[in-house]
Structures are given as structure tokens and as C-alpha cells.
Amino acid sequence: MARLENHYKEKVVPELMARFGYKSVMEVPRLVKITLNMGVGEAVADKKILQNAVENMQAIGGQKPIVTHARKSIAGFKIREGMPVGCKVTLRRARMYEFLDRLISVAIPRIRDFRGLNPKAFDGRGNYSMGVREQIIFPEIDYDKIDAIRGMDITITSTAKTDAEAKALLEAFKFPFRT
């Protein structure tokens, strides 16, 4: 069992039950999935760029990413419907907790000029989204082997009903929010 999963069951659940007055353990918000998404617009010109992005994503997420395709044609961006434009990975259960552990303890402290995560990035339904400008903050990425610095979106989906519950859940996992 992942370290953060144990932490959730032993410390976070009782803490949130006391704080929000839940009657059942099943009411306590929990993490459902973490989605990593990398949009690679330059892949239109060169297929190798997308292949490198897929390899980076596989190293970071620990599983093979799905290549995403354009939903409709946009002449201004020179893309046609069905063209590959990015990749994404959905992490659940043990891999999700392992990734979250690496994100909080290793990757986020390596972000340059980091002043804390934006506490307003919740969507109103208990999910949190953040952007990462460089994939090199993850220790799995070898700086010498990357072709370009790419960013990615990280979305944390939880069963929380409100933003306050979701924020309390992530704070219990020691998320470094800006004050």
C-alpha cells in the first residue's frame, strides 16, 4: 500500500470526519483519479515530437499514455479532425497515490520561483487543476535526453462536494497552497 494511502486512511479520514461532522466514513472525500494531460500542438509538423512527449509522459505517469486527437478541424492552427495533438494518462488507486507522493515531496519543490499553489484553482465541484510549465521538475525525466521543455496539466479529481472539502483534503496531504 502506498505511503499516502496509509496516511489517508489513518490520519486524514478521522481529521476530516471531526472537522466536517461526517457520520459515516464513506462520506469523507477521497481521491478518485489524477489526470495528466500534455497538449503538443507542434506535433502537426513533426510526428517525432509527439513520440517524445509520449515517452516523457510514460516516464512521469508510470503507464502508457493515450494519444489524444483533434475533435474538429481548425485552419488557423493547421489541424484537421482526427490528427494527434497530445497525450494523457489517467492514474487511479496505487499509481495515483505514488504519483501524488512524488509530486508533493519531489516535483513541486523543484519548480523555479515557486511561491505556493493557487488556492483558487478549484472548479466548484471539488476538483483541483494545476499547470506545470516544465516536465523536467520530475526526477524521472533526464534533462540531457529531452528535445524540448513542455508543460502539462494535472487534474486531481475527488469525491468532495464543495471546494472547501477538497481543499481540506489536499491540505491534509500537505499540498503547499499559497496563503
Curated annotation (Swiss-Prot):
GO biological process: translation
Record keywords: Ribonucleoprotein, Ribosomal protein, RNA-binding, rRNA-binding, tRNA-binding
InterPro entries given in the database record: Ribosomal_uL5, Ribosomal_uL5_bac-type, Ribosomal_uL5_C, Ribosomal_uL5_dom_sf, Ribosomal_uL5_N
Pfam families: Ribosomal_L5, Ribosomal_L5_C
GO molecular function: rRNA binding; structural constituent of ribosome; tRNA binding
Top-rank lineage group of the source organism: Bacteria
One GO location term (cellular component): ribonucleoprotein complex
Family under the similarity heading: Belongs to the universal ribosomal protein uL5 family.
Subunit structure as annotated in this protein's UniProt entry: Part of the 50S ribosomal subunit; part of the 5S rRNA/L5/L18/L25 subcomplex. Contacts the 5S rRNA and the P site tRNA. Forms a bridge to the 30S subunit in the 70S ribosome.
Annotated function: This is one of the proteins that bind and probably mediate the attachment of the 5S RNA into the large ribosomal subunit, where it forms part of the central protuberance. In the 70S ribosome it contacts protein S13 of the 30S subunit (bridge B1b), connecting the 2 subunits; this bridge is implicated in subunit movement. Contacts the P site tRNA; the 5S rRNA and some of its associated proteins might help stabilize positioning of ribosome-bound tRNAs.
Listed name of the protein: Large ribosomal subunit protein uL5
Organism of this sequence: Methylococcus capsulatus (strain ATCC 33009 / NCIMB 11132 / Bath)
Lineage, top ranks: Bacteria, Pseudomonadati, Pseudomonadota, Gammaproteobacteria, Methylococcales
